[in-house]
Amino acid sequence: MAGFIGKEKHAVDEKGRLMIPARFRRKFPETSGSLASKKEPASLYVMKSPDSSLELYLPDVWEEMARTISALSDFHPDERLLKTLMYESLEMVELDRQGRIPLSREFLDHAGITRDVVIIGADTKMIVWEPGRLSEVLEGSSGRFAALAGRYF
């Protein structure tokens, strides 16, 4: 898998484009896509997260998730709702030659992004936060790291 780690501060330009940090782009698998250089995928999947961030997935990672989602039943109300919520919150975007992705107004508004962002590498995905919202989340959970780590590790 890609193994994204660390964080980078960037800004969305006036056209709503976000530069994917070079160190994250270096983790992308090689591609021959005409819209990207040799080490950049032609596309990423962007999903609105329930915590008001945006999640970025490489196509192979999203396709694995999509197989799980597709296995859900259209005849079970909760499973059908989950499918609807997942796909309603998803867009596929293409990287340009400079390694930027366009973010729609709907997605920028969801995350509260006007300009500055923090991009966090989270193993198989990248998480895009508006800096103020990220600070609120981190400050609100400052004493919980040890408890969470103890519970899950």
Curated annotation (Swiss-Prot):
Ranges of residues in domain SpoVT-AbrB: 7-61, 90-133
Stored InterPro entries: MraZ (IPR003444), MraZ_C (IPR035644), MraZ_dom (IPR020603), MraZ_N (IPR035642), MraZ_sf (IPR038619), SpoVT-AbrB_dom (IPR007159), SpoVT-AbrB_sf (IPR037914)
CDD domains, per the entry: MraZ_C, MraZ_N
GO BP terms: negative regulation of DNA-templated transcription initiation
GO terms of molecular function: DNA-binding transcription factor activity; transcription cis-regulatory region binding
Cellular component terms (Gene Ontology): cytoplasm; nucleoid
A Pfam family this chain is assigned to: MraZ
Signal peptide: none
Compartments, as annotated in UniProt: Cytoplasm, Nucleoid
PROSITE patterns reported for this sequence: SPOVT_ABRB (PS51740)
Keyword annotations: Cytoplasm, DNA-binding, Repeat, Transcription, Transcription regulation
PANTHER family attached to this UniProt entry: TRANSCRIPTIONAL REGULATOR MRAZ (PTHR34701:SF1)
Family: Belongs to the MraZ family.
UniProt cross-references to NCBIfam families, sorted A to Z: PRK00326.2-2
Oligomer status and interactors: Forms oligomers.
Protein name, per record: Transcriptional regulator MraZ
Native source organism of the sequence: Chlorobium luteolum (strain DSM 273 / BCRC 81028 / 2530)
Upper lineage: Bacteria, Pseudomonadati, Chlorobiota, Chlorobiia, Chlorobiales
